[in-house]
Amino acid sequence: MVPIVEPEVLMDGEHSSDVCLSKTSEIIKKCFEELILHKVDLSGIILKPNMILSGTQSKERISSEEVSNKTLECLKNSVPSDVPGIAFLSGGQSELEATENLNLINKNNNTNFIMTYSYGRALQQSALKVWSKNMKDRE
């Protein structure tokens, strides 16, 4: 059995990417403090965090390159090196955003973490939208 640790800062709100970075770092560090306190073997877990993004109601929009840089900064400063893998949440991003952001995170990855994804909505949204239509409207 592999524990999946899922701390998440939601995209809802007006927060900036810097606030997201600060709060995500704080939450991840606290999670690991507790895991270490309870003697969890960190080499046997998967971390499932959010990417560093501004809130959906924020005026700030950052590029995928900035998402990548801030997300990797957060991981390097917050996650112990014995954690083997990171499985990112899409967290309400569109299919395109989630894919572009993950692609750049992987390209820029200068950590020892194996990166992957655990997307639900970001992979299913288009199909669900089509399937929700009447058969006549699908063509």
Where in the sequence are the language-model features?
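Conserved strand-turn element in the central/C-terminal portion of the radical SAM core barrel
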Residues: 6-16
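Active-site capping/gating regions of soluble enzymes
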Residues: 15-139
